[in-house]
Amino acid sequence: MGPLQFRDVAIEFSLEEWHCLDMAQRNLYRDVMLENYRNLVFLGIVVSKPDLITHLEQGKKPSTMQRHEMVANPSVLCSHFNQDLWPEQSIKDSFQKLILRRHKKCGHDNLQLKKGCESVDKCKVHKRGYNGLNQCLTTTQSKMFQCDKHGKVFHQFSNTNRHKIRHTGKNPCKFTECGKAFNRSSTFTTHKKIHTGEKPYKCIECGKAFNRSSHLTTHKIIHTGEKRYKCEDCGKAFNRSSNLTTHKKIHTGEKPYKCEECGKAFKRSSILTTHKRIHTGEKPYKCEECGKVFKYLSSLSTHKIIHTGEKPYKCEECGKAFNWSSHLTTHKRIHTGEKPYKCEECGKGFKYSSTLTKHKIIHTGEKPYKCEECGEAFKYSCSLTAHKIIHTGKKPYKCEECGKVFKHSSPLSKHKRIHTGEKPYKCEECGKAFSRSSILTTHKIIHTGEKPYECEDCGKAFNRSSNLTKHKKIHTGEKPYKCEECGKAFKCSSILTTHKRIHTADKPYKCEECGKDFKYSSTLTRHKKIHTGGKPHKCNKCGKAFISSSNLSRHEIIHMGGNPYKCENVAKP
């Protein structure tokens, strides 16, 4: 029994028959033939394009084509259209001869002719104005075999046999590899390619191979760019009918796929399948490199880049490369200044959705992250993580250069710049560079002269909030920073830190020129002038210059002619 061919579903006209059809009938015929051809191509049945299809696509008459092989000389004249028709018995006889010729092994008894058109004269479609002969041929030929059990009609006798298997419930084709069974040998053959990895269908355009011809046919649309499936609601076009079906649910709001576990509904069955893994914990996608498993194929694809080290996404602006396209998209906003994520409450824009999410907490006042140890709540998860270290006392971040440890990674990153000398934050006004962005922000105030921090007690203004905080202690007399060694108290933590060196003899400031160590950075700065020979402090009276301001002050007493330091206990002579 031969496979299904285009000629099995095609009807051809002579020139005389073609002229009997009006324009609507011709268009209908053309649409049906082209649709039949496309369906066969989709199923991978048609390899080369028939001449009939070429003529129809070009809008030509099918007059050059030979009439279908089963058509004999007409013997009856149609009274409606002056068209030659066969008597009904001639139709049946001709079809039976053709079927027996093509299905010799089946036997005459196994073939049941479907009575699709009892009489040519009684054919309803013919009376409505369609070609009676070809309608009868189409009706008779397209549904030739009938199932005795359900009355279902089939095009070929082989389809009848396939259908009968459904009644028996048998799956004669079973695969030993996975135990899966099939009721058709063709489905069984296709399934085997999953295990063998065979991909016999190759795209001529790009070389990509597929294990099914239907997949290749679908793939080819990528190269042609054809989008023949159009949405009637919005006009959007798609290259696959399945994509159009999925798209239509946007307009209808339909979500037919419901999760039995939690009741959540979805537009697509594939999304439901993926969603179910949340409940089952299934992770079907495994990395061959390290064995790690993933719930989603996309997550595995993203993970694989870790092993290859590939960074295929490159920024055209600065040349920086990224593992993922999403990271490149996010990075580009640095150059464009784009802030697509806008707060509906205050209108402020953000580059990243995560930043907007954090920002929204300002308006809600929500503190969703709570410490289990002490109950303190935080706005951000990172703040909670940082807080937890207070309870553990751990300092997990260690400087490899000097061994200093930190509770958080960010202070370690800043600390490392002391060793590297890196100063990535540069002032556009004067070119001065800084190791921290906060220091640059503070520095910029020098150029603007702005002093936004004002003391409520005396009205004095400061360009830094830290300076205002220190100043306020003058009014309060507060000295919160106490030395554990000697009990001395200080207004500022920095002064306490400096003071502690008296007890420890720590000299962290080293001269690169001679290696001498100093307790204070100011002392090191003065010392460096010995090597440079610089004397920036000049006397206005005589022009003599000094290395330090204190030396200048002592010198100026000479010009004053006085002895400013007088002992009150010494008696006058």
From Swiss-Prot:
Ranges that cross the membrane: none
UniProt domain KRAB: residue ranges: 4-75
Single Gene Ontology BP annotation: regulation of DNA-templated transcription
InterPro entries linked to this entry: KRAB (IPR001909), KRAB_dom_sf (IPR036051), Znf_C2H2_sf (IPR036236), Znf_C2H2_type (IPR013087)
Stored Gene3D superfamilies: 6.10.140.140, Classic Zinc Finger
Ranges annotated as C2H2-type zinc finger: 145-167, 171-195, 201-223, 229-251, 257-279, 285-307, 313-335, 341-363, 369-391, 397-419, 425-447, 453-475, 481-503, 509-531, 537-559
Keyword Repeat attached: yes
CC per GO annotation: nucleus
GO MF: DNA-binding transcription factor activity, RNA polymerase II-specific; RNA polymerase II cis-regulatory region sequence-specific DNA binding; zinc ion binding
Subcellular location(s) per record: Nucleus
Main location: nucleus
Keyword Repeat in annotation: yes
Keywords: DNA-binding, Metal-binding, Nucleus, Repeat, Transcription, Transcription regulation, Zinc, Zinc-finger
Record family assignment: Belongs to the krueppel C2H2-type zinc-finger protein family.
PANTHER family noted in UniProt: ZFP14 ZINC FINGER PROTEIN-RELATED, ZINC FINGER AND BTB DOMAIN-CONTAINING
Function in brief: May be involved in transcriptional regulation.
Protein name: Zinc finger protein 66
Organism expressing this protein natively: Homo sapiens
